[in-house]
A protein has these predicted regions:
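Bacterial N-terminal signal peptides
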Residues: 9-20
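Short, compositionally stereotyped local motifs that mark structural "simplifiers"
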Residues: 101, 105, 156-159, 165, ...
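Solvent-exposed beta-edge/loop recognition patches
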Residues: 110-119, 146-231, 359-382, 386-388
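Middle-to-C-terminal accessory/interaction subdomains
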Residues: 240-247, 340-345, 349-367, 374-377, ...
Length: 828
């Protein structure tokens, strides 16, 4: 960075040589403190061979524009240096006296949307001057050690006008101000505001600090703004690009308080609660119906006796203070629950408006918003809730965790049941971030963080069992096919018992971050139902392009197949298709397809909604217990496929025409059947999930839900412990093997052993074989014989492949699959 100065040189003659001093004044006075001295430069004035005089600057080599003049009074000769550029001081220093002011900050924004519909934190700048100001060259930073970290481009702020800057690392330095409606196109910094508080600096091009603000920790939806007189205060309703006096300002936040003695939890007898100790003028007000307290709620100024299950929600109020925290405790009196407990506190309107009891029959889509979203009700409303979790049920001595969250109904026809499925989500607007807790046994200690979970009534299998749908996913643990982990819990709403629910992982962008460590915001996550594709994150463009290419091109052409392999995880796709087929899911492939991709990963498919698997064919047109799944996929499921490129089933129907994919599919089928898709594994996973149930809790739930009275309606007897799943799967083993053999003209199966010796692994058709570690393979299993198999030897870092046990030296090879085949890859 350089600054412009004007310099005056005073010379005195010494023969043909002139010696002088040059005094340079900074013409951009705002770029340095007022007491900074002029720049002194030593010079020598000399003449050239033509007698022309010029100034030689001895200490700063530079080419200068000058002209000579004579003082008319003294006769002294001067050389005026017209422009001299010298390096400016790059140390940020206070200048102030600026028309550009920082007037409001909101680190956790909820309502001021950017041009993408997102809600990043923002900073408001106000031009208090009488003329428009150009922000070009100004820096807006949170750290003076990086004072040019983010610099504005060419952007004007009109006189007496506001401008917000979004802080989200998107790095947009200049933008034409548009979108004055719901969305707002504005500049974006390359850094984020700190939720815990911090500082912000507006620095001019010459490193002068024009304004700065230190802001406190702010909870979701609040802002920190300046009011008349220069004081900074809290705002419950932010005022982006508006005067701050249009909203109520608060001097401080209401202080936190604690209940004296008894906290929420399980008690054998009634509990007496005494009012909390608070500072003068502070009043604690509470509700006991699940709703959030207000300034009009009853004051907690005398003892409260809790003699039955009660949720107590309290907040502190005082004139001039902003209340941001509600303390919630659920008290259980005389309850005995041996399973984990989820206690949900929610406004009673959730039940009167949405969580309605029905008597069955077809939903009234025109009048009841509780049913699946439709044209009249495009999405389920989400209400704020408080969730408390007791890991050991009534034996818990304290809450394992608690969190503010949101709740909404989910599911379709299963909403007709008394017990309904809901989604619990943690969002910034509720003050919640990631929940760090091992919710699911199979992920314990791996990456225990979640942005929410589902509480399912077991969907369409509501009258059949507790967890068959979950078993269908659990058998895939370790296979690389995504599924939603599960556990059984008991749910209470506002202290009222609602029975056993299936706590389930949520499928969305956050699932990918939890399970793969990939930034959630980089993920495309899609739902494919029939011929409709929607994205819950990212866009549908890549997915639709993938469908168009694979479904619209000849996959027997090698180049096309190679392109397909770059678009989807081909091994994952094969394993996913095999799992759906084995489970015999009739509500697929024209429904319930989920997939995701990221910059690092091609499209991966995810097992979802297996209610109509495991011999449950109720209400699926054209599907029965004897339906051949290959024929079902070829026809596109119950809705058919025809030649439409939006048909999901067509992906398989086209790819299977390629001999390489057919070979991969058959060999993957051998491994999947041997290690994951078999009766023994189904039985083991059913026992694992049944072990999460408690007999007394099951008896209570069954009595409340009256499953026994519903058996005749659906011709299914209730199977709480999943005892029917194993026997069904044992029969399915032989049945599905027969379907595969018939489909591909195979005659039998034989034992194949694949191993490594030294530090390296063997991939079978790109698959890490079960039991492999990061540096070794040792697998033995049954394979369909009569075809070929691709094997690839992969050394770990520092090792080299030294050949196969049969003398072959190529790392990648094809072998005939025969009974007794044994191959070892050697590494050294």
């Amino acid at each position: 960075m350089f600054k412009k100065v004007n310099c005056l040189a005073l010379m005195f003659g010494l023969g043909m040589t002139f010696v002088g001093l040059v005094a340079c004044e900074d013409t951009t006075s705002a770029s340095r403190p007022n007491d900074a001295p002029p720049v002194q430069i030593e010079t020598t004035v000399v003449q050239d061979s033509n007698g022309n005089s010029y100034v030689r600057i001895d200490t700063i080599p530079s080419t200068l524009d000058t002209h000579k003049t004579i003082d008319p009074v003294t006769g002294d000769t001067f050389v005026v240096i017209d422009t001299l550029f010298i390096p400016a001081d790059t140390t940020p220093h206070w200048v102030g006296n600026s028309a550009l002011l920082i007037t409001e900050i909101s680190p956790v924004n909820l309502n001021w949307l950017d041009e993408n519909g997102d809600d990043p934190g923002w900073i408001e700048i106000y031009n208090a001057g009488t003329e428009a100001a150009n922000l070009k060259g100004y820096a807006l930073v949170e750290n003076l050690n990086k004072s040019r970290k983010w610099v504005f481009g060419d952007e004007l702020i009109a006189a007496k006008s506001f401008r917000t800057v979004f802080c989200d690392k998107n790095n947009v330095v200049a933008v034409e101000t548009t979108g004055e409606g719901e969305f707002h196109a504005r500049t974006h910094t390359n850094w984020k505001l700190e939720k815990s508080g911090g500082s912000v600096y507006l620095i001019d091009p010459y490193y002068g600090i024009r304004d700065s603000v230190q802001y406190p920790e702010l909870s979701a939806g609040l802002s920190w703004g300046i009011v008349d007189g220069g004081s900074w205060k809290y705002f419950a309703t932010p005022t982006p690009e508006q005067p701050n006096n249009v909203s109520v300002a608060y001097d401080a936040l209401a202080p936190k308080f604690n209940f004296n003695g008894n906290q929420g939890g399980f008690y054998t007898k009634e509990v007496t609660l005494n009012p909390p100790t608070v500072s003068d003028g502070l009043k604690v007000r509470c509700t006991q119906d699940g709703s959030a307290p207000t300034e009009k709620s009853p004051e907690f100024n005398s003892a409260i006796v809790i003699s039955k299950n009660t949720v107590l929600r309290c907040a502190a109020y005082k004139q001039g203070l902003l209340t941001t925290e509600v303390v919630t405790n659920t008290y259980f009196i005389g309850e005995t629950v041996n399973m984990p407990v989820v206690a949900v506190s929610v406004d009673p309107s959730f039940f009167t408006k949405y969580y309605k009891k029905t008597n069955g029959g077809e939903p009234d889509m025109k009048h009841d918003q509780m049913y699946a979203p439709n044209e009249s009700y495009p999405e389920d409303p989400e209400l704020p809730v408080h969730v408390e979790y007791f890991e050991n049920g009534s034996k818990s001595t304290e809450k394992a965790w608690e969190s503010e969250a949101g709740i909404s109904l989910m599911g379709g026809w299963s909403r007709m049941e008394r017990k309904k499925s809901v989604a619990i989500v943690m969002r910034e607007e509720y003050g919640g971030g990631w929940l760090h807790y091992p919710l699911f046994e199979t992920r314990k200690g791996v990456n225990d963080k979640y942005k929410g979970f589902n509480l399912r009534n077991n969907g369409n299998r509501f009258v059949a069992d507790y967890f068959a749908d979950a078993v269908g996913g659990a058998i895939l643990e370790g296979s690389g096919v995504d599924y939603q982990r599960s556990r059984q819990v008991v749910v209470f709403y506002n202290g009222t018992y609602y029975g056993i629910h299936d706590m389930r992982e949520r499928y969305n962008k956050n699932f990918v971050e939890t399970n793969y460590g990939i930034d959630a915001n980089s993920v495309n996550f899609i739902k494919h139902l029939n011929k409709t594709v929607t994205a819950s994150n990212g866009t549908t463009a890549d997915y639709l392009a993938m469908l168009a290419f694979i479904n619209g091109n000849d996959m027997t052409v090698a180049e096309n197949y190679e392109m397909a392999k770059s678009l989807i995880d081909i091994g994952n796709f094969a394993d996913y298709m095999l799992a759906e087929m084995y489970i015999h899911n009739g509500d697929w492939p024209d429904n319930n397809v989920r997939a995701w991709k990221s910059p690092e990963t091609p499209w991966k498919f995810m097992i979802y909604d297996l209610d109509h698997g495991f011999q449950w064919d109720w209400s699926v047109s054209g599907f029965s217990e004897s339906t051949n799944m290959f024929k079902w996929v070829k026809q596109g499921g119950k809705n058919g496929c025809n030649s439409d490129n939006l048909c999901f089933a067509k992906l398989y129907n086209n790819l299977i025409k390629n001999d390489n994919f057919k070979r991969l599919f058959v060999n993957h089928a051998s491994v999947m059947l041997g290690s994951y898709l078999n009766g023994a594994n189904v039985t083991a996973k059913a026992k694992f999930l049944a072990g999460m149930l408690d007999a007394s809790d099951v008896s209570r739930d069954m009595a409340v839900e009256a499953y026994m009275d519903r058996r005749g309606q659906y011709s299914h007897s209730f199977d709480p412990y999943g005892e029917k799943l194993g026997p069904w799967a044992n029969e399915r083993d032989d049945e599905f093997k027969s379907e595969i053999q018939s489909e591909f003209g195979l005659s039998g199966m034989g034992t194949v052993k694949i191993a490594s010796n030294g530090k390296g692994v063997v991939l079978m058709e790109g698959m890490n074989l079960p039991g492999s570690t990061s540096s070794s393979t040792n697998y033995s299993g049954k394979f369909f014989t009569g075809g070929m198999m691709e094997l690839t030897a992969v050394p770990v870092e520092g090792a080299v492949f030294a050949g196969w046990s049969d003398g072959v030296t190529e790392a990648t090879r094809f072998v005939a699959v025969v009974d007794g085949l044994t191959l070892t890859a050697n590494f050294k």
